[in-house]
Amino acid sequence: MVKKVALAYSGGLDTSVCIPILKEKYGYDEVITISVDVGQPEEEIKKADAKAEKISNKHYTIDAKEEFVKDYIFPLIKANGDYEGYVMGTSVARPLIAKKVVEAAIKEGAVALAHGCTGKGNDQLRFEAVFRQTDMDVIAPMREMNLTREWEIDYAKEHGIPVEVTKAKPWSVDENIWSRSIEGGKLEDPSFVPPEEIFEWTKSAEDAPNEPRIVDIDFEAGVPVALDGEKLGGYALVRKLNEIAGENGVGRTDMIEDRVLGLKARENYEHPAATVLLAAHADLEKLVLTRGELKFKKIVDEQWSELAYYGLVDEPLYADLNAFIDKSQERVTGTVKVKLYKGALTILARSSPNALYSEDLVSFDSQTIDQKDAEGFAKYHGFQARMYRKVMEK
């Protein structure tokens, strides 16, 4: 019987060297590679396909772009998804990729699932949270063999596998429609200033246009549906906003991130559309949700973000949180106007048919509310503090 292993394949160095390793070191007869398109550059997909066709036994490329936006990015927006300032593009993509790999593995009759993640990062956990829901063996060559980037480069050359990274510029890039991450090499030193060459989606503030770009974003039930009045599908909307915001230098993050294992890591990200959509959505929520809803939802959003970052999207709690979030978003419909200028994002205005805001009630010129009615409330505001003071002064 032919022993098959299904490998989550990106076309990069790590997953490419996994192919001969799985045969030579682990004894598998065939390696089935699966690439999942969640918005990577088309050229990257083509390169991965071409490389896999040469070095794997069978290759799948699965288009999951629309599914990724609809089922993973839109829930993230509704939850104001944020982990320590990170918009979690890689985090929410991994479970979807893992599920597609499992589907292909079952179709091919594979007995094992493999990934190219290291033992120091988060992705190993995100993949395996899905992989280990099956009865198939799970293999992680990078982790199990304790491989280094330098060793992989040499090994790839020995096996005729083309590599684009070098020992001098060994940073790793992961990209999907929501974010682009750049890490590794000299970037691991938190005191190292990243060279401008690592950025592709965003212009520097210095090179951004000298005129601001104003954008109107329409939301329906917490989900963005239009830019400047033009209705767009989810993937198309995020892609277009990436271009607009990135051109104006919006959407860069350089941060120290606490990984799941407890390690601190220096990470560089680009996420133009994510920056704009999350800010606009949160602003619209303030217009339509009650104070109590906003206060409680912050707790829910934080818990949701942690589960999403950890890759635990199949946890019952994750579904419970989504149920509350979805209910809260029923009224989050309206338009937010934003200004993008040389790396800065400014909310200019917002409107909603469900706004709890009343200009008439809050206006200094309005007499709709008799200000004297507030006197009774004011007398008892801070009442317990006054009682406490009297007790302490006895």
From Swiss-Prot:
BP-aspect Gene Ontology terms: argininosuccinate metabolic process; L-arginine biosynthetic process; urea cycle
Q: Which residues bind L-aspartate?
A: T118, N122, D123
The UniProt record lists the keyword Thylakoid: no
EC code:
6.3.4.5
Whether Isomerase counts among this entry's keywords is no
Q: Which InterPro entries match?
A: Arginosuc_syn_C, Arginosuc_syn_N, Arginosuc_synth, Arginosuc_synth_CS, Arginosuc_synth_type_1_subfam, AS_cat/multimer_dom_body, Rossmann-like_a/b/a_fold
UniProt catalytic activity: L-citrulline + L-aspartate + ATP = 2-(N(omega)-L-arginino)succinate + AMP + diphosphate + H(+)
In this chain, ATP is annotated as bound at A8, Y9, S10, G11, G12, L13, D14, T15, S16, G116
This protein's assembly is summarised as: Homotetramer.
Protein name as catalogued: Argininosuccinate synthase
- Record organism: Methanosarcina acetivorans (strain ATCC 35395 / DSM 2834 / JCM 12185 / C2A)
